[in-house]
UniProtKB/Swiss-Prot annotation:
The gene is Suds3. Pfam families: Sds3. It comes from the Eukaryota. The keyword Ligase does not apply. The lineage of its organism: Eukaryota, Metazoa, Chordata, Craniata, Vertebrata. Residues 2-170 are annotated as: Mediates interaction with USP17L2. Residues 188-226 are annotated as: Sin3 interaction domain (SID). This is Sin3 histone deacetylase corepressor complex component SDS3. Residues 1-22 have a biased composition (Low complexity). GO terms for molecular function: histone deacetylase binding; identical protein binding.
Length: 328
């Protein structure tokens, strides 16, 4: 209801009864009541207007929020598209920063790898030179040792051949084959025809060396003693006197090889031990035991590094004598 409607006078009734008496106090009360009614209606109208304005304001605020949110989304999307474009072009700051860090790490790893390669190459070259020198030295040592061993073997074979020759000369008479005297009997008439003997002819006499070198040398010395001429007996010596006792045999030493060691004169000798080697002609040599075999030992002279082979039998018979000496 508008304010004009509130202020317009009410329509008069069609047929009104007789007017009552007029009193000024009643008129004032009537005006006061009308004023109260108008003020009440005005307050109601203001409240309705305020409610309507608040509703419109809420709708307007919601529209502004939606519009603002849409604007923020568009701005964010535009920023991401711009960053994507910069990334594809390679001009994005974050991309350049990370690429710079990766490039630095790459260069550092390449430098470390090159240093490691150089270090390993130098180490391999040093090892190669060292191994090459060791191989050359070992080759030269083996060559010298092989030469010495071959010379020693040839010398030993030469001595064996000389001993065989001497043995054949000493035992030549016993090797002569004497004809066997046979008697042929007359064949009886009923005896079968004799079948010729098809047995093989005996092989010519030959020496079978089934003895050790020490035993052979001992036998040779015995033969030499028997072969030497005997002195004639003195005519004044009575026949009943006992004969002069034979020369006492040579002194024998205890010598043997066990577990790669030489046991000689109540002492043990091993490989690489420094010794003195004395021969029967009073020659004293400074030597080192280079190896210990089954029946012999090899010694190396410290003066010229030549090697000699000494048999256990020679040590037992005293042909060579071994003495200890300090390694210095």
């Amino acid at each position: 209801m508008s304010a004009a409607g509130l202020l317009a006078p009410a329509p008069a009734p069609a047929a009104a009864p007789a007017a009552p008496e007029y009193y000024p106090e009643d008129e004032e009360e009537l005006e006061s009541a009308e004023d109260d009614e108008r003020s009440c209606r005005g307050r109601e109208s203001d409240e309705d207007t305020e409610d309507a304005s608040e509703t419109d304001l809420a709708k307007h605020d919601e529209e502004d929020y939606v519009e603002m949110k849409e604007q923020m989304y568009q701005d964010k999307l535009a920023s991401l598209k711009r960053q994507l474009q910069q990334l594809q072009e390679g001009t994005l700051q974050e991309y350049q920063k990370r690429m710079k860090k990766l490039d630095q790490q790459y260069r550092e790893r390449i430098r470390n790898a090159e240093l490691f390669l150089q270090l390993e190459t130098e180490q391999v070259e040093r090892n190669y030179i060292k191994e090459k020198k060791a191989a050359v030295k070992e080759f030269e040592d083996k060559k010298v040792e092989l030469k010495e061993n071959l010379i020693a073997e040839l010398e030993e074979k030469k001595k064996m051949i000389e001993n065989e020759k001497l043995t054949m000369e000493l035992t030549g008479d016993s090797m002569e084959v004497k004809p066997i005297m046979t008697r042929k009997l007359r064949r009886r008439p009923n005896d079968p025809v004799p079948i010729p003997d098809k047995r093989r002819k005996p092989a010519p006499a030959q020496l079978n060396y089934l003895l050790t070198d020490e035993q052979i040398m001992e036998d040779l010395r015995t033969l030499n003693k028997l072969k030497s001429p005997k002195r004639p007996a003195s005519p004044s010596s009575p026949e009943h006197l006992p004969a002069t006792p034979a020369e006492s045999p040579a002194q024998r030493f205890e010598a043997r090889i066990e577990d790669g060691k030489l046991y000689y004169d109540k002492r043990w000798y091993h490989k690489s031990q420094a010794i003195y080697l004395e021969s029967k002609d009073n020659q004293k040599l400074s030597c080192v035991i280079s190896s210990v075999g089954a029946n012999e030992i090899w010694v190396r002279k410290t003066s010229d590094s030549t090697k000699m082979r000494i048999y256990v039998g020679q040590l037992q018979r005293g042909l060579f004598v071994i003495r200890r000496r300090s390694a210095a």
